[in-house]
């Protein structure tokens, strides 16, 4: 007996009917499949239904043989909960399958999956199975030791803490892009030779040349950092991916065992996978029952190695033969928004679908985000636009909008909630203060929130200074809190530079804390 997507939907939730797009995704053959899903298009529910369809129609697939990968622990937990709930419903309605469905699917972050491969199979490439994970704080401490002992200045324009942060960031970028220190050196030196041909004709060219030279200088500490980690039996997050990729590439038996263990694989937020993650997954699960879900319009991790071509090259990387019809599908029904809101969103996103000038004449991209269409029965909705000239008027318009929405009648006795989005994080406290002043309770979601409160900022300033005495902006915050005026702070800055010159240092390396510890005599003037 073969169950269709519509029949399975009726079993788990008879109030919903899958769209034709969802049916095509759910019932797709067991082969590499790319699903380009717009925002709010029900991708998680559709992926859950695909898992149920595979379980109901393929006896060799069990819940434990389903692998779901995503980027955060929270997302992995939510995906696991959704799958377990749906599997329980299917098992209850189809008793003949209950014994085979008495297991849980495996949902992990991409990094956790790599860590599992290394911990279980690392010995096959000479990795000690008792390795320890290096935390972010541990990485900072280790790199700080290396930088402080480095025989030459690595960057005159940055504080020691700034240098450490930049070097660790570059180390992560090298790993995420699949480079070694040596191959990165060759690439950067080659780029440097190209820059020499261009010359220092303008400020942008000079800045680019300087940045490239800085990266080359940072490679030395990175090389020592990696050596120290090996000697101490430590791995960081980037190491997990590099070593896991090496294992599946060099040990065919591991690759075969993992493919046998996981008969079906779901790759969530695939547009944000990095070069090294793509290499790991395509090496391991090429020509396998892999469903990758993503949306190029929601790519957010390009700064840390995410490949812009992840969606475009999915079938090329995961399939040896030519792609067939039906291997790239879309989900375009937006279940969250009314018609006018979708019209505005599609208009804003329209430039993202245009072919860039450097791609002119090439084949149209086949992994573009779909134009969203409203759900059946969607209302017209309302889009209001305010464009005040003054910032204070913009805040007032925001408060007025939130107040009007919260005043609308509701049926469940609860006030309507409102989300306020801002392009700039520094606007959060101002928006928050304006809403609170109007008597509207608020919560700042994500980073910030409590950390932005003045008292907490003062505590953080003291801690930052305890870690890095050169963190002058944090000291300036504390000094401003004891009623020192702008003229006083300027005078302290001048005195700090005077002390630096007296010690034979570059004035740009002046430390404001030195000026506070050894203040100038009354009447001093530079």
Language model feature labels by segment:
Residues 1-127, 133, 228, 252-256, ...:
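P-loop NTPase Walker
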Residues 2-3, 7-10, 15, 48, ...:
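Conserved RecA-like helicase ATPase core segment
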Residues 152, 317, 378-381, 407-526:
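ATPase/helicase motor core of nucleic-acid motors
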Residues 1-36, 41, 45-46, 52, ...:
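Accessory N-terminal region flanking or inserted into the helicase ATPase core
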Residues 62-75, 83, 105-107, 268, ...:
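Conserved RecA-like ASCE P-loop NTPase motor core of nucleic-acid helicases/translocases
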Residues 95-116, 134-135, 439-465:
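Conserved beta-strand -> loop -> alpha-helix junction used to position metal-binding or nucleic-acid-contacting
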Residues 11-19, 23-27, 31-39, 64, ...:
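Inter-lobe coupling/hinge region of RecA-like P-loop helicase motors
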Residues 100-104, 122-219, 230, 324-335, ...:
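ATP-hydrolysis module of ASCE/P-loop NTPase motor domains
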């Amino acid at each position: 007996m073969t169950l269709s997507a519509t029949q399975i939907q009726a079993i788990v939730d008879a109030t919903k009917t899958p769209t034709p797009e969802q049916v095509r995704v759910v019932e797709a053959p067991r082969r590499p499949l790319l699903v380009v899903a717009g925002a709010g298009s029900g991708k998680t529910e559709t992926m859950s239904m695909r898992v149920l369809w595979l379980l109901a129609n393929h006896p060799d697939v069990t819940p434990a043989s389903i692998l779901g990968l995503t980027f955060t622990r929270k997302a992995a937990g939510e995906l696991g909960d959704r799958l377990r709930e749906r599997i329980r419903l299917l098992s209850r309605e189809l008793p003949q399958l209950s014994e085979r469905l008495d297991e849980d699917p495996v949902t992990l972050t991409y990094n956790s999956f790599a860590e599992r491969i290394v911990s279980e199979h690392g010995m096959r490439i000479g990795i000690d199975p008792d390795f320890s994970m290096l935390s972010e704080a541990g990485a900072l401490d280790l790199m700080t030791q290396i930088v402080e002992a480095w025989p030459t200045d690595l960057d005159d324009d940055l504080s020691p803490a700034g240098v450490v942060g930049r070097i660790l960031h570059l180390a992560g970028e090298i790993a995420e892009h699949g480079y070694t220190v040596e191959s990165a050196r060759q690439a950067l030196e080659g780029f440097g030779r190209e820059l020499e041909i261009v010359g220092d004709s303008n400020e942008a060219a000079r800045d680019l040349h300087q940045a490239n030279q800085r990266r080359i200088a940072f490679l030395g500490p990175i090389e020592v950092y990696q050596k120290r980690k090996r000697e101490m039996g430590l791995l960081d997050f980037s190491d997990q991916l590099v070593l896991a990729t090496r294992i599946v590439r060099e040990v065919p038996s591991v690759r075969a065992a993992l493919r046998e263990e996981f008969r079906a694989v779901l790759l969530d937020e695939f547009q944000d996978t990095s070069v090294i993650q793509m290499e790991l997954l395509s090496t391991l699960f090429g020509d396998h029952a892999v469903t990758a879900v993503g949306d190029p319009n929601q790519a957010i991790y390009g700064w840390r190695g995410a490949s812009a071509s992840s969606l475009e090259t999915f079938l090329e990387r995961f399939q040896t033969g030519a792609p067939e019809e039906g291997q790239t599908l879309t989900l375009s029904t937006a279940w969250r928004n009314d018609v006018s809101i979708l019209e505005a969103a599609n208009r804003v996103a329209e430039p993202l679908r245009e072919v860039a000038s450097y791609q002119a004449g090439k084949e149209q991209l086949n992994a573009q985000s779909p134009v969203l269409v409203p759900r059946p029965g969607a209302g017209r909705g309302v889009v209001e636009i305010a464009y005040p000239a003054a910032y204070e008027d913009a805040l007032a318009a925001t408060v007025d909008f939130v107040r009007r929405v919260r005043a609308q009648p509701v049926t469940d006795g609860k006030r309507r909630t409102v989300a306020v989005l801002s392009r700039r994080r520094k606007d959060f406290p101002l928006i928050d203060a304006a809403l609170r002043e109007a008597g509207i309770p608020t919560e700042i979601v994500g980073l910030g929130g409590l950390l932005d409160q003045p008292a907490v900022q003062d505590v953080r300033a003291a801690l930052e200074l305890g870690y890095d005495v050169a963190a002058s902006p944090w000291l300036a915050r504390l000094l401003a809190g004891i009623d020192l005026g702008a003229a006083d702070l300027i005078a302290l800055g001048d005195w700090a530079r005077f002390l630096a010159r007296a010690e034979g240092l570059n004035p740009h390396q002046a430390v404001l804390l030195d000026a506070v510890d050894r203040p100038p005599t009354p009447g001093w003037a530079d």
